[in-house]
Design a protein with these regions (language model features):
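N-terminal amphipathic/basic leader segments beginning at the initiator methionine
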Residues: 1-15
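Mg2+-dependent prenyl diphosphate-binding active-site environment of isoprenoid biosynthetic enzymes
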Residues: 12, 16-128
């Protein structure tokens, strides 16, 4: 299994509402910037150790990648970073308020991905 390709395909398949565009477009932009995707890959690898099909852990992998990118939106703003992975940061391309709100929305999206995870301890996991 090509984990990076699977993760990128799954991220690209996530749909967000079309409105308000100013809130959701920056999320798609941030998640499309690429990266190593180390965290979601580790989630899938850990699942592969215990189960035959690591795809069952894809919602958890998407959750951790979405959460990580939410922190990057806020971090770029706090650090006044102009570029991320060779592209303008969200607060530069849009504005600071959009970066904060889109980052907060990504946190909610991460929890939604966790809700989609099919695991026996989901309630316990979400209570943390």
């Amino acid at each position: 299994m090509d984990y990076l390709d699977s993760i990128n395909r799954a991220l690209n398949a996530v749909t967000y509402p079309s409105e308000p565009q100013g809130l959701y477009e920056p999320i798609a932009y941030a998640l499309s910037m690429g990266g190593k995707r180390l965290r979601p890959t580790l989630v899938l690898l850990a699942c592969a150790i215990y189960r035959n099909d690591p795809e069952v852990a894809m919602p958890a992998a998407l959750a951790i990648e979405t959460y990580h990118n939410h922190t990057l939106l806020h971090d770029d703003l706090m650090d006044h970073a102009d570029m991320r992975r060779g592209k303008p940061t969200v607060h530069v391309k849009w504005n600071e308020n959009t970066a904060v709100l889109s980052g907060d929305t990504m946190l909610i999206a991460a929890f939604r991905h966790l809700i989609d995870t099919n695991c026996p301890n989901k309630e316990r996991m979400l209570s943390l």
